[in-house]
Amino acid sequence: MLIIVACQFIAPKVGVASPLILLVVGLAIGFLPQVEAIEIEPHIILEVVLPPLLFSAAVRMPTMDFRREMQAVAMLAIPLVFLSAFAVGFVINWLVPAISLPWGVALGAVLSPTDAVAISIAKRSGVSHRIITVLEGEGLFNDATSLVLLSAAMSAGLAADEHALNPGLLIGKVAIALGIAAGIGWVVGEVGVRLRALIKEPSADTVFSFAMPFIASVPAEHLGGSGLVAAVVAGLVVSRRRAAMISAANRRFSQQNWQTMTLVLESGIFLTMGLQAFGIVEETAAFSGGLAFAAFLAVALGALIMIIRAVFIAIMLAWLDHRRTHRQRRYEVENSRIARFEKRMNAACEVDADMLQARDLSPEHWENALNHYRRRLKRRARRNAMRGSDLDYFENEPLGPREGSVIVWAGMRGAITLAAAQTISTHAPMRALLLSIALFIAAGALVIQGLTLPGLIRIVKPKMATGDISEEERAKLLTVMGSALVDTALAQAIHEVDGQTLLSAGVSRTLSRMGHAVSADDEAAGMRIARTADRILTDILQDATTPDAASASETDDDARTTVDMSEEEVERSFTRDQIRELALEAIHAQRDALLQARDEGIFSSAALEGALARLDNEEILLVSSHGVDN
C-alpha cells in the first residue's frame, strides 16, 4: 500500500503515469537476489480483480456517449481481436513450427486486449472526449472476446485439431458467450439498482455495490457466458439508472469508495506484473535461443499487431464517416417526412362535422384517431431529434486521421495480457517462450507507447477537449432546469411570495442553485450566468402565470401574483421542513428533466454531469441539514 501511495505521489512530479512507475518498481523488486521468483494465480486477476475494475469503469461511462460509439467499440472489441489473434497465430506457427496454429492463436488472443493505462495517459493529455470514450469502450469488451477466443484455441490445441478453429464456430461461441453474459448482466443491473434504491444507509449500499460485479460474473461463467461482459453490462445499467433511483448521498459515498478500491486494484495489477517478470525470464532462459529469441519474436509480433491495428482503424474511420453521411441524409429525409406529416395532421384537425358525418365517423372516434397519430408524430420527432443531436456530436468531435493515430498508438498491452498468458495450459508446447513473448510485448508496449503517447499527441495535434461549456449550451441547460420548476410547489410559492425576498431570507436556494449548477470557475462568468438564470427563470414563471393574473398585474399593482414580505414574515410563513421539501421537489424535477434531456442527446455528457453533480450537492446539503435540525 505504501508503494502505491509513493508512486501516486511521485507520478505527477516526474510526468509519468503511476502504473508505469509501479511496473518499474515491481521489476526492480522482482530481480533482487534476495527475492525468490513470484508466481500469482492468474485466476485471481481474471476472476477476482477484473470484474470490479470493469464494473467500475462501466458505471463511470456516460451511457449516452457509449450508445453513440457502440459501432466503433464493437468493431474494435470483436473483429479486430479475431484478426490480430489469427495473424499472430499464423506468423508464429511459420517462425516456430513447434508451436501449432491453435497455440499460436491462443497467444494471439492473449496479445489482443488493450490496457486501461492508455486511457489515463490520454486523459491527462487532454484529448477529445470522443477518443476517450472509444478507448474506454474498447477496453470494456475486448478482454471478454479475447478470453473466449483463448479458451476455444486452447481446447483446439489440446485436442490437436486445427479444424476446431473454424471462424464460423468461433464466432458462434463468442456470440453465445456474449449473449448469455449480456442477459445476466442486464438482470443483475436492473434488480441490483432497484434493491439499492431501497437501501438508505450509504455504507450498506456501497457494500452491496461491491458485490454486484461478482453477482453478475459468477453465474455467467457457470452458464457458459463471459463473466467480464456480465459485469460490464451490469455496470452500464447502473450508470443509466442510478441518478434516477439511488439517493445522491448513497451515490456520492459509493463513488468515493469505488475510486479508492479502483486505485488499489489497478496499482496492484501493475506491481504484481513487474514482480512476476523474473520467474518468467528465468524459465525462458533455460530454453535454446533463450531470451534473445523471445525478444526477437516479441518485437516482430508487436509490430505486426500495431500494423494490423493501424490498417483496421483507418478502414473503420472511413466506414464511420460513410455511416455519418448516410445518417445525415436519413435525418434530412425524415425531417421532410415529419413536416409533411404535420401538415396532414393540421389539415385533419380542420375537418368539419359534415365531413365526419359523410364518412360515418363520430367526433370522438376522430379525436381518438388524431391523438393516436399525434403520439406517433411525437415519437418520430423525438427519434429524429436524437439523430440530429448525434450528428452534431459527430461534427463537433470528429474522428479523423489525427484522432485515429492516437487511438492506434494508445492500444497498448498490459497486465491483462500477462494474466491471460499465465492461463495457457502447461501442456502447451514451449509455454515458457509464449509467456516471455507476452511479458516482453506487454512491458515494452507500456513503457514505449506509454512514454511516447503524450509526445505523439503534441505532434499530430488531434481534437482536444475544451473543458468549457458554451454559453448557448449553458442557456439551454438553464431553460430546461427552469422549465422543470413550473409545475412544482416551489413555483406556486414563488408566485405567492416575492421571489427575491425568498432568496434574501434564505428560504429557498433553488433559484440561485440554477446559476451555480452550470456555473464556471471564473467569478465574473459565474455572476453573468447567475443573472442569466434569474432572467430565464423570471420569463418562465411569468409565462406560467395565468392570463387573468397577468392582465390584472398590468392594471393594478396591488393585484400582483407576488407580494412584498419581510424576511421575518417569510420565515413565519414557511417552516424549515416545508422549505426543505419545496427545494427537494424542485431538485427532483430538475434532475428528471436533465435525465430526459440525456436520453434525447440534447446536451454534452460533460455539461450534464456537471449540472447533475451540482444538484446532488444541493440534495446532500438539504438532507444533511435535516439531520442536524433533528
Residue positions per predicted region:
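Cytosolic C-terminal regulatory domains/tails of membrane transporters and channels
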Residues: 366-377, 461-630
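Transmembrane helical cores of multi-pass secondary ion antiporters/exchangers
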Residues: 1-477, 575, 589, 594-629
